[in-house]
Every structure is written in C-alpha cells, then in structure tokens.
Amino acid sequence: GAAFDDQGQPTPAATGFARSCGVTVDQLERLENDKGQWLVHRALVPGALARSLIEPCIHSAIEKLPIPKRMRWGEGLAEFVRPVHWLVVLHGQRVLPCEALGIAAGRISRGHRFMGEARISIRNAGDYEKTLKKQGAVIADFNTRSRLIEQQVSRLGIKAGGKTVIDPQLLDTVTALVEKPHALLGQFDPAFLKVPTEALISSMRDHQKYFHVIDTRGKLLPVFITVSNIRSTAPGRVRAGNERVLNARLADARFFWETDNRRPLDNRVDELDGVLFHQALGSLHDKTRRLETLSVKIAQTLRVDETLCARAAHLCKTDLVTGMVGEFPELQGTMGRYLAQHDKEPAAVARAIEEHYLPRHARDKLPASTPGRVLALADRIDSLVGLFLAGEEPTGDKDPYGLRRAALGVIRILIEKKVDLDIVELVNHSADTYAAAGNPVGANAKKQCIAFVMERYRALYAALGFAQDEISAVLEAGASRPLDFDRRLKALAKFRHHRDAASLAAANKRIRNILRKSEQSIAKELKPQLLIESAEIALSEAILETAGAIAPAIARADYPAALRILAGLRPVVDRFFDEVMVMVEDLPLRTNRLTLLGQLSSLFLTIADISLLQTPERPSGR
C-alpha cells in the first residue's frame, strides 16, 4: 500500500503522517475497513479556556492573510495592510483580554466616518452586526454588502436600458471598499465607443472600479455604475465628478489607440530588439525568430497552414511595444488582434495573436483556432526550454516565470483540443532553435524540462478525481504524448473495477519484484525449447496470442478494449504462479522464465504499470 514498500519499510507518506501527529510509525494504529487497511492515530486532547486560545488564534489568522505588502504606522512595530485603531473581542457579554497588532481588546468599535456614531459600545457578541448597522451605519457582513451591491447595480443597469456585467472579482473588491454601499449611474461620451471595447472596460473595471453595462446584443453602452460609500445629499455632484475622471481616462485610451494605428505591426518587429526576454536568452526579437521556426515545425507535424502560423508568430509580440499595451498591460494579445485587423492581416493571423496567450490561468478557455493553438504551444515550449537552459526552473513555491502554468497550458491544449503531439519532440524542436542561435541546450536541461512538464499530470488529474496510483501507473508506462496519456488513464481508471484487475495488479507486482531482485539480466529472446512445464508453455502461447490481439486496439488508441483483452490472461497467469518455480537452480531455465515474465510485464506496460495499483489482494502460488 501507500504506507509501506515491498520490503515492509514505511514510505515517506507514512513517516510524514506520523511526524505530523508527533509520534513514530510504530506508534500508529492499523484500521481495516471495506476500503482497505489504514494507519490512524488516536489522541485525547484536553479542553482549554477560550481566553487562553483566542490571542494565538487571532495572530495565526492575521499571519495567514494573503497580504503582499504590509505597512507600519505610528511608533509601533505592528504591520498590517492598513493602520488598525481598535480591536473588539467578546465572548457573550465579556471582553476576552488579549492583544493583537499592538492594540488591547475592548468592546468599543467605530461607526461610518460620515453617517454613524463615532464610538459604539458593543454590549454582546451576538448583537455585533445589529448594533453596528443601527448606530454606526455599517453593514458588517461581507456577503450582505455584496448582495446589496449586486441588487443595486443590476437595477441601475436595467434603468439604463441594458444589463450590468457583474465581474465576481470586481464585486468582491468593491464590497471590501465600502461599509454602506450606494450605487450611482453615470455616463461617458459615446464617441469613445470607437476605442476597442476591452480598453474601455479595463478603464472602468480595473482602474476606476466601475461596473459596465451592455445592451441585448452584448454591445457596450456609454454608461457606468460606481458604488459610493455614502448616500450623498448632492448625488449629481458625485456623479459629475466620476464622469469627469472617467472621460479623462478614456481620452488617454483614445489617444494611444489612434497613435498606435498610424504604424502597422510589421514595422514594430525590430523594436522588440530593445525588449529583454531573459538575460541569458536574448530579446523578444530573438524569441520571435525562434517562434517562427518552431511554429512552422509544429504546423508541419499537424499538417496545417505553415504560412499563417509563421506570420502569426512573426507579429505575436509586437503589440507589447504599443502605447495601448503600455497603458493596459492586461490587454496584450487583444490589442494585437485589433491592430492586426486594422492592418488587414488575415483573420486567422489576428485571431492567433490574441489566442496564443490562452490559457492565462488554470481554468481559462483554450485557443479555439488551429494557428492559435500552434502558436500557444510554441510560445510556452520556447519559454520552458529556454528558462530551464538558463537555470530558472521553479523551486518550492517560487515560480517567478510562471513555468508551472505554462506547462499545464501545454498539457491542457494537447488533451482538451485533441492535438496528438509528443512533448519530447516539442522540446527537442525547441532546443534546435536555441542551438541554431548559438545557445545549445544540454541533455540534462532537456531531461529536466520534459520531466517537469510531465509532472504536471499529477496536479491536473488529481484535481479531476483520479487516484495517485492510477496516475503513477500510467506515468511509469510513458507519458510523453498527453492525449495518449489521457486516454490510457481513463481506461485504467475504469479497468481497476474489473473483476480480474486486482489479481492481475498483484501478479504484476510480484513479477516486478522477481525481476528486480534477480541478479542476472533477462535474455533478449525467449527460447521455446526451454519451456518444459505445461503452465509456462500455456503462458508463452497466451502472451503471443494476446500481443497480436491487442495490437489493433492500441493502434487505434482503444485502451478499454486492450485492457479487456489483457484481463483474459488472468487464468493462465494464476496457473503459472501455482505450478511453476521461477527461481530454479538451473540458470538457463531460470533466465528463460525471467524472460517470459519480462515479456508479460512489457505487454501490460504498453498501457500502464498496473503493479502500481494499490490492492490488498495477492496471487497464490510459489
């Protein structure tokens, strides 16, 4: 199982579990149920008083908050995202004496700066929200504020003749910025609608924290919704102030857009010489040259239009030196598409320029077009190979170049878009482009890069609910073609519930142990004349017959069918172990039987190393 290896020694998983419990593996108990045998630890933990627990709990919670930048205030040494002026810690009606961030706990809170009482005494912990709302004009509950904002902005969108687009991240941000939300509808100059929609939305959403509104066709309307922290007595002035700020920002966006349109993307390629990709790997212009070569190579393998892919690769980074992307970095690729369309580039080229950044994160959409997929693969493989060459592989939780995300993107594209390419070949092709530029990639760097990409399978498929032993079993059989890996893994996950799967897994585990412990090497070919026992003759014949039977299924990647055929070997395998002694004194006979077992193991390894499947069952025999 996962807790002990074949020699009965505890695995790192078992020792780690014991260490986390503060005991040794020997002190753990064994629990057996219908799902197998488990290691467990039981301990009696005495209760503790709330007042002794609350302060360390508060400190722990504060430390775990994802705050990238902390600040200090006053003369104290406490650090937090913003200055902290009071702390309320109550258990029922009683103040729990403790301290956090240099502040002693009490029962005095504060209301809304403009709409509530300056000092509010909280009599009872259960009255906290009600008291703050009544006396302080503060809606303390985050979810309540969020729902209120959503209702308000939705109503205003309808009032404007459209529908408010509620971005969840923006909703969370605005909810955290206000205590008493009050939404206001504003307008901007319709002339700005000539600027790319994404830039207008970015100005509203990312820069101003405004919600935008679309019509029934999904077109942007020249209105916005801001959420104020007060109900102003002069809402017109508040609205006018927000309109003035937004119109100024949109005017900047229009200026950059009109300026960028004066130069075609093709004229910007040389500017990439001035943009560093990596100190050891050259500029973005150098990367562009490599992408052109690699994209063509991938296009040839997939038998798709090389010219379109090469053109998209030539232009794909040029929008990075435009004013629009300088102002809106999050729109890289999108601005490239707009500018390519303006330059009358082929539609497929414009689309690929935008799509080659997909997926941007784990759950993002994938490139929909073939040139987009080709370029997305080339871009990520080039970065992976180059940065491993430069010694920038991720360590621990540090991944400054996003290589885990890049590797996962490669795997997702190949699997979900059913692109049957080999990772090893992609890495080798990319390494060739570096070598052609005078920067050869060593064998070790390539090996590390390939292993790194394949290791992404674990996180991806574990998140999809596949067991680690299933993933390990397929990885052991080879996983350089992600689409093929996906098909084999799904077939194996179903096969493990087959009535003969457990017995075959146990038999394969025994075969693996025998082969590993054997001191002599296995012969390249089986010698039929040395097959003397009827059980080993039957096994040899069954292996030959099964190999021929599964070959067509494997050729068409029908792994469920191949595994069903392999399952038919169980009776002859069980008989072999019941009737045949492998490790006999006769060396030629022993070598021949080891060779026979090697052939059997290799037959299963065309799909997976099923000996790695965890099962309590063991084969009988000698």
PLM-predicted stretches and their roles:
Residues 1-622:
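Amphipathic alpha-helical "coupling" segments that flank catalytic cores
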